[in-house]
């Protein structure tokens, strides 16, 4: 039988127009900071695994719904990496202040996505979205047949980062 020794024989791919977000960001590390700029990010998901008794690896509708909820939290925000080793970040009242060397940004808190990442790169955004989606699926006991998940985050046409992790279902 083809694939008899493999955990995953099927995969689903979700790449819908509404799985996008527009956000500002800048990359900063010691000795370097990009100018603040933005992207129209596009997110896609690949899920690998076995078929359930209902004929699904994972329901497309659930993947779309949960991913959409995640990207909505990032849409029209300035992404700030809360775990940065070179940014000083303060949240006071309704403002977020971000400082790097001599530069200082004061932003309305409602317009900031303060994320548990070190850099606001497409790579770390892909891992962040993967982690959030995995947490939501785990909470719903929806990972029984899933052996791997992959998230891609495109900053523009032909330019994307991918984060993939194996899950090894029971």
What role is predicted for each listed range?
Residues 2-170:
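Charge-rich, low-complexity N-terminal segments
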């Amino acid at each position: 039988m083809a694939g008899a020794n493999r955990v995953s024989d099927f995969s689903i791919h979700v790449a819908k127009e509404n799985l996008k977000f527009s956000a500002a960001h800048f990359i900063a590390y010691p000795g370097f900071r990009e100018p603040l700029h933005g992207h129209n990010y596009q997110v896609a998901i690949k899920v690998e695994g076995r078929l359930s008794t209902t004929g699904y690896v994972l329901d497309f509708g659930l993947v779309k719904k949960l991913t959409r909820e995640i990207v909505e939290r990032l849409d029209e925000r300035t992404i700030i990496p809360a775990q940065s080793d070179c940014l000083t970040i303060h949240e006071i009242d309704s403002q977020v202040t971000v400082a790097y060397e001599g530069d200082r940004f004061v932003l309305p808190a409602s317009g900031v996505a303060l994320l548990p990442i070190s850099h606001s790169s497409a790579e770390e955004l892909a891992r962040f979205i993967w982690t959030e989606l995995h947490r939501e699926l785990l909470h719903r006991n929806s990972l029984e047949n899933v052996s791997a998940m992959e998230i891609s985050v495109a900053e523009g046409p032909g330019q994307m980062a991918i984060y993939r992790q194996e899950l090894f279902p029971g």
